[in-house]
């Protein structure tokens, strides 16, 4: 059981069936930060800086490697939204503006908070893009040998033996495909 709690670079080495349990440490870290902030009286601008600079930054490294479920991301967003709207520790206030509107850019009438799920997909798409752009890197060669030896990273199909990290990266493939245009070069990879 101890092996299941091993961490490397702050990330779990083994992700079991329960993703909520595996990533609960992210919620705990954000919650602990926000509890410390509640003791201070902060202006809206102060809260905005703390939310953007700390609460939304804490899960960034994990999100660049693992897919966080939409439900889990909604729980994180809900926790942040409750903090944003509350005045004191146990005091709930009315949300006058929906969280979706707050995640819009400032130019579009929002506050520029991140949509955590969309940001997670974008971070995973970034990993896919690295595999596409740097096929000679050690990581790309390792992934190609294990998961797509006879095709491109953009043509990967899900199989039963995929690790959770690779399955997570596959969530970013569709986003990359939306922005990629096939360019015919020498014609060697065209079927």
Identify what each model region corresponds to.
Residues 1-191:
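A helix-boundary/hinge signal
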């Amino acid at each position: 059981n101890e092996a299941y709690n091993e961490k490397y670079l702050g990330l779990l080495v083994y992700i079991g069936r329960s993703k909520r349990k595996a990533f609960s440490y992210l919620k705990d870290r954000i919650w602990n930060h926000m509890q410390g902030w509640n003791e201070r009286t902060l202006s809206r601008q102060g809260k905005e800086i703390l939310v953007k600079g700390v609460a939304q930054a804490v899960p960034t490294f994990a999100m660049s490697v693992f897919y966080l479920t939409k439900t889990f991301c909604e729980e994180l967003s809900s926790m942040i939204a409750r903090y944003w709207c509350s005045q004191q520790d146990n005091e709930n206030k009315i949300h006058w503006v929906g969280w979706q509107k707050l995640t819009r850019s400032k130019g579009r009438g929002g506050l520029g908070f991140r949509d955590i799920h969309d940001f997670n997909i974008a971070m995973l798409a970034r990993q896919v893009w690295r595999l596409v752009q740097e096929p000679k890197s050690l990581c790309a060669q390792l992934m190609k040998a294990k998961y797509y030896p006879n095709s491109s990273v953009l043509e990967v199909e899900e199989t039963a033996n995929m690790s959770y990290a690779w399955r997570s990266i596959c969530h970013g493939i569709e986003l990359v495909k939306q922005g990629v245009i096939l360019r015919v070069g020498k014609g060697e990879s065209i079927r």
